[in-house]
């Protein structure tokens, strides 16, 4: 009995703290015809039944007594309407009264199915479609406040700012505010700082009235280094062995977007000279990044970011000095901290008292002296390293942070880099490479340190018996292609792992003058391809050779080359001298899309973001089997749902989603956007996206909602699929699983339809190739696998295909 009263008392106290309220969402609208059997109306509250005095139900303001198809359950908190008909429509209300006479009430509107607009049933009561409550924008930009609602027309709208009425074409701010009574959006152009405030829209129709409040924050355009803050600078974290630790760090970021890095300082003894030096390691630490509500933004603006770094199952090697670093090209800020064992807690934070712990102090004085010397030395080394990094950043005028920007699982291999003259820095870099490591995809080769005679590079990699082969098992045939740092050969392989006998393969290797970053990319690509696994629609890893002085990657060979060239060679151009090797049908084109969608669905299930889905990165194998290439450098997102690109380089602009273009945020949903562009390429037989549109105009057009028109010979279903992939809000785009279902249905419809009766594709104008804009470490994409030949064809884009990130930002400012 006493325990029961304790429970009631606790529940009563919780109600007193949080207030009497319903446990389900508030008022909502129901339509007859949605369910053929019954409807449940829920008025459950956060209060024990013993403390509820009564519950009153009404129908159209009349108390519900005994009705044949209406029953109450759970002490009257739920109402069930069974086999309801049109006379059951109307407004239902419930009022819950507690023992202390406090009460709450809510309403439910059941609308008859006969209230329609055309042939489509509509909601009569008003409901806001977009519930965004915070908008952040930069001065001089344009801002649209969206109050679009669902409900019966006509809908009247009233706008209020800071309790002051805004009239249509108002002179509140020199006619910068504009809206139409029939257009439920308020537009503000040429934003000023005084445009910030609380905006309220009030919507009303004959069925009721609702309001929606939005907070608008306006910031000046800032170019500054990021600011790192935490609860306590130079904080010390005390933990025991086996415990987990989370280190929270807060960053205020301005333009350009910052890069994040966690560094660990430790001592390392040279096996040759027995000399001990301080070393700096970039940590593969798992983390979670959150953009705080205060800093959410629509364009380029100030951002308030929280990063939680996770140290799991603390061991001896985790204790020591750490420094978090956030920076951009304008500078950097750091947050140093220590992780120590709890046995040092009293002696470090609270100096020992002479009377009570003098004995303990004497016993540990020697140990503490050693620790003090080590810690002091580490801090001195850390300061020196920070100075060196700062000096390099100043000289190069570019951020050189090698941002992990993803989560890591466990180091598999260690690359020890000995870059020659260590006296200049006094630091040996040790970089861990793991199965989920994915390094830079885009880079400028001129900014990388080349490995030459003065910079010897020692590489130690443990062989993996499941993949390792000897060079004697490979016999190269001819050069398929090469880029700035790598080559790909066609070869004959014997007795590869899990495959006996002889087969034709592609072998990738680095050039002699490759740089440090290329080597890291190469190793990480191997590990990613190992960890992802095999699928029929991706380019699969077959073997690796790493123990005979050089690194080689052996992958499947696709003799038809990349999909873009394959489609161009087989497009139905009506010319006398045209030679078409294969007649492409509508069934084939749909099958190509379906195969790529299946491959991408597999990569998405492995939490991998490709970031460059395009026809040039899809290879065509035997039987016209589609294989997605260049996913070895895709980003792994096992612990978070997005990846923010933080390095400079050339970008495939025309294939990038809006959020990737303007915020450099990549998700599986941004891959969906790129897949829509790929589908457009396939339907147009390798056409160039956004034909005739200059890149400097493309950004503005995309922000205004422009999408490519339906191309020639494209079905309605396929074009609808493309438009769904190009929706501005990422969450509104379909998943790859949904795309597979749609494409399988289209494939059935196209099983007997060919392109015989379709109009021919006009030849494109000759494209002038520029310097390689996309020379990534993976050379297995684009034109390296040539059809029936081994001619050299260096990777390159047309001028329209790629832009640097600086170009994107400048274009964004020009149209903002």
UniProtKB/Swiss-Prot annotation:
The record's section on SMART domains has: IG (SM00409), IGc2 (SM00408), TyrKc (SM00219)
Q: Catalysed reaction per UniProt? A: L-tyrosyl-[protein] + ATP = O-phospho-L-tyrosyl-[protein] + ADP + H(+)
Query: Care to name a GO molecular-function term for this sequence?
Result: ATP binding
Write out the catalytic residues in the record. Answer: 612 (proton acceptor)
Give start-end of the signal peptide: 1-19
Look up the domain of life of the source: Eukaryota
Which GO BP terms apply?
positive regulation of cell population proliferation
Q: How does it sit in the membrane?
A: Single-pass membrane protein
Assigned GO CC terms: plasma membrane; receptor complex
| Ig-like C2-type domain residues | 25-105, 126-217
What ranges are annotated Cytoplasmic (topological domains)? 392-816
Disulfide-bonded cysteines: 43-94, 147-201
**PROSITE patterns tied to this protein:** IG_LIKE (PS50835), PROTEIN_KINASE_ATP (PS00107), PROTEIN_KINASE_DOM (PS50011), PROTEIN_KINASE_TYR (PS00109)
Enzyme Commission (EC) number = 2.7.10.1
Q: What is its main location?
A: membrane
Q: Which UniProt keywords apply?
A: ATP-binding, Disulfide bond, Glycoprotein, Immunoglobulin domain, Kinase, Membrane, Nucleotide-binding, Phosphoprotein, Receptor, Repeat, Signal, Transferase, Transmembrane, Transmembrane helix, Tyrosine-protein kinase
Coiled coil residues, start to end = none
Family assignment?
Belongs to the protein kinase superfamily. Tyr protein kinase family. Fibroblast growth factor receptor subfamily.
Summary of the function given for this chain in its UniProt record: Receptor for basic fibroblast growth factor.
Annotated protein name in UniProt: Fibroblast growth factor receptor
Q: Which organism is it from?
A: Hydra vulgaris
């Amino acid at each position: 009995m006493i325990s029961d009263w304790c429970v009631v008392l606790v529940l009563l106290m919780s109600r007193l703290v949080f207030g009497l309220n319903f446990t389900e969402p508030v008022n909502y609208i129901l339509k007859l015809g949605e369910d053929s059997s019954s409807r449940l109306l829920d008025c459950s509250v956060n209060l024990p039944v013993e403390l509820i005095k009564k519950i009153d139900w009404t129908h159209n303001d009349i108390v519900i007594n005994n009705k044949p198809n209406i029953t109450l359950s759970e002490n009257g908190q739920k109402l069930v309407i069974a086999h309801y008909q049109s006379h059951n429509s109307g407004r239902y209300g419930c009022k819950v009264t507690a023992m202390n006479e406090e009460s709450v009430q809510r309403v439910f509107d059941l609308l008859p199915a006969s209230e329609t607009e055309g042939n489509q049933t509509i909601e009569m009561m008003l409901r806001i479609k977009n519930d965004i409550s915070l908008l952040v924008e930069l001065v001089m930009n344009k801002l649209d406040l969206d109050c679009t609602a669902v409900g019966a027309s006509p809908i009247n709208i009233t706008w209020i700012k800071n309790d002051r009425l805004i009239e249509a074409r108002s002179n509140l701010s020199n006619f910068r505010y504009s809206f139409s009574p029939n257009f439920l959006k308020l537009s503000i152009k040429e934003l000023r700082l005084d445009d910030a405030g609380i905006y309220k829209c009030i919507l009303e129709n004959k069925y009721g009235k609702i309001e929606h409040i939005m907070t608008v924050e306006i910031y000046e355009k800032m170019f500054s280094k990021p600011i790192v803050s935490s609860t306590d600078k130079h904080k010390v974290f005390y933990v025991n062995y086996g415990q987990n630790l989370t280190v929270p760090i807060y960053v205020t970021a301005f333009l350009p977007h910052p890069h994040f890095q966690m560094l660990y300082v430790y001592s390392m003894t040279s096996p040759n000279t027995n000399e001990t030096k301080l070393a700096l390691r970039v940590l593969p630490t798992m983390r979670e990044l959150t953009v705080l509500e205060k800093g959410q933004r629509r364009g380029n603006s100030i951002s308030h970011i929280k990063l939680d770094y996770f140290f799991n199952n603390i061991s001896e090697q985790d204790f020591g000095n750490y420094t978090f670093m956030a920076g951009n090209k304008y500078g950097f800020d750091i947050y140093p901290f220590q992780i120590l064992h709890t046995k040092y807690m009293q002696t470090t934070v609270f100096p020992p008292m002479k009377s009570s712990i003098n004995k303990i102090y004497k016993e540990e004085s020697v140990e503490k002296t050693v620790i003090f010397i080590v810690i002091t030395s580490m801090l001195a080394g850390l300061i020196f390293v920070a100075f060196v990094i700062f000096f390099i950043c100043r000289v190069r005028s570019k951020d050189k942070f090698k941002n992990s920007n993803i989560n890591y699982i466990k180091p598999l291999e260690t690359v020890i880099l000995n870059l020659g003259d260590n006296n200049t820095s006094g630091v040996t870099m040790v970089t861990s490479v793991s199965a989920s490591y994915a390094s830079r995809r885009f880079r400028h080769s001129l900014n990388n340190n080349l490995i030459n005679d003065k910079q010897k590079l020692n590489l130690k990699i443990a062989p993996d018996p499941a993949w390792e082969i000897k060079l004697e098992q490979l016999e190269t045939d001819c050069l398929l292609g090469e880029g700035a740092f790598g080559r790909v050969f066609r070869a004959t392989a014997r007795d590869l792992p899990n495959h006996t006998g002889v087969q034709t393969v592609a072998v990738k290797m680095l050039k002699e003058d490759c740089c440090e970053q290329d080597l890291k990319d190469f190793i990480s690509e191997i590990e990613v391809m190992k960890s992802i696994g095999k699928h029929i629609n991706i380019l699969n890893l077959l073997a690796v050779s790493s123990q005979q002085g050089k690194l080689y990657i052996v992958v499947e060979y696709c003799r038809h080359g990349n999909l873009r060239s394959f489609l161009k060679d087989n497009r139905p151009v009506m010319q006398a001298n045209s030679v078409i090797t294969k007649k492409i049908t509508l069934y084939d084109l749909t099958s190509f899309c379906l195969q790529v969608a299946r491959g991408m669905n597999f990569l998405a299930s492995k939490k991998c973001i490709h970031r460059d889905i395009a026809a040039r990165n899809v290879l065509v194998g035997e039987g016209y089997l589609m294989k997605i290439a260049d996913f070895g450098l895709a980003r792994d997102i096992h612990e978070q749902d997005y990846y923010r690109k933080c390095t400079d380089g050339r970008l495939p602009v025309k294939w990038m989603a809006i959020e990737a273009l303007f915020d450099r945020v990549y998700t599986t949903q941004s891959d969906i956007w790129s897949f829509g562009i790929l589908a457009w390429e396939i339907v147009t037989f390798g056409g160039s996206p956004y034909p005739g549109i200059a890149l400097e105009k493309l950004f503005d057009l995309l922000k205004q909602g422009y999408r490519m028109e339906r191309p020639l010979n494209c079905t309605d279903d396929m074009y609808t699929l493309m438009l769904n992939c190009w929706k501005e809000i990422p969450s509104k785009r379909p998943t790859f699983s949904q795309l597979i279902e749609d494409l399988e249905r289209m494939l059935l419809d196209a099983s007997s339809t060919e392109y015989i009766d379709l109009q021919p594709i006009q030849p494109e104008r000759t494209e002038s190739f520029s310097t390689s804009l996309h020379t990534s470490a993976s050379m297995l994409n684009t034109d390296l696998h040539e059809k029936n030949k081994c001619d050299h064809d260096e990777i390159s884009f047309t001028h329209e295909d790629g832009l640097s990130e600086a170009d994107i930002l400048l274009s964004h400012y020009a149209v903002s």
